[in-house]
Regions:
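Conserved non-catalytic scaffold segment of RNase H-like nuclease domains
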Residues: 1-123, 143-161
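Acidic two-metal-ion nuclease catalytic site recognized across multiple nuclease folds
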Residues: 1-7, 152, 171-202
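Short alpha-helix plus adjacent loop in nuclease-associated cores
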Residues: 114, 126-142
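Beta-strand segments within the central parallel beta-sheet cores of soluble alpha/beta enzyme folds
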Residues: 124-127, 189-191
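Conserved glycosyltransferase catalytic-site signature
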Residues: 128, 163-167
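Short glycine/threonine-rich catalytic loop with a Thr-x-Gly-x-Asp
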Residues: 138, 160-164
């Protein structure tokens, strides 16, 4: 059952988005979705798609992500990909949604759901940026940026500001964090969901 589920049995869906701007409220949209589903340290599913946001991509965003208007010209709209993405997330009472700086990605996904009049599932959301601050000290890392953590945990994929690469890097960071949490006796999903306080000082 969920109440005793060990983290090694938990399915985590690690998501990263690229977007056309900083906030949905400013008219920005999703340009790319990358998601990796993992359980017990194994990748059991991958979701990747470009999304046509219906707005032009600024030179700044193209420079940051390498994504151009031409790449998105024939891409599906968020309305076309959203149902299959929600299906990929899986059952909300079992799977955990993970993102680095989760409020950003989840904010865009919730805005898309609202715009499409699509029910947003109530998955537990784990933010690797926040979790890293609980298990690491300033002596370990200078900041909790994805690239810094990916290097610290020896991630096999380097973040590139492309959705799937960043999601894969976040998977390795998540696994590193879970290993650290085990050292604090946190091994089950209910314990994981309750991690709210810093576990290390400094």
């Amino acid at each position: 059952t969920i109440s005793t589920m060990h983290l090694s049995q938990t399915t985590f869906v690690v998501v990263d988005l690229e977007t056309s701007g900083a906030a949905p409220s400013m008219g920005a949209g999703i340009t790319e979705i990358g998601a990796v589903k993992v359980r017990g340290g194994e990748v059991i599913g991958v979701f990747e798609t470009f999304v046509n946001p219906g707005v032009e991509i600024s030179p700044f965003i193209t420079q940051l992500t390498g994504i151009t208007d031409q790449m998105l010209a024939n891409a599906p709209t968020i309305g076309q990909v959203f149902p299959s993405f929600i299906e990929f997330l899986g059952p909300e009472n079992e799977n955990v949604l993970v993102a680095h700086n989760a409020p950003f990605d989840v904010g865009f996904l919730k805005a898309a759901a609202a715009h499409l009049d699509y029910p947003w599932p109530n998955h537990h959301v784990a933010d690797t940026a926040r979790l890293a601050r609980y298990v690491l000290t300033r002596d370990d890392v200078i900041n909790c940026k994805l690239a810094t953590l990916a290097e610290f945990f020896g991630a096999t994929t380097s973040p590139t500001h492309r959705a799937l690469d960043d999601a894969r890097a976040t998977v390795d960071v998540l696994h590193g964090i879970i290993e650290r949490l085990g050292g604090f006796g946190i091994t089950t999903l209910p314990q994981f969901k309750k991690v709210k306080k810093r576990l290390v000082s400094g």
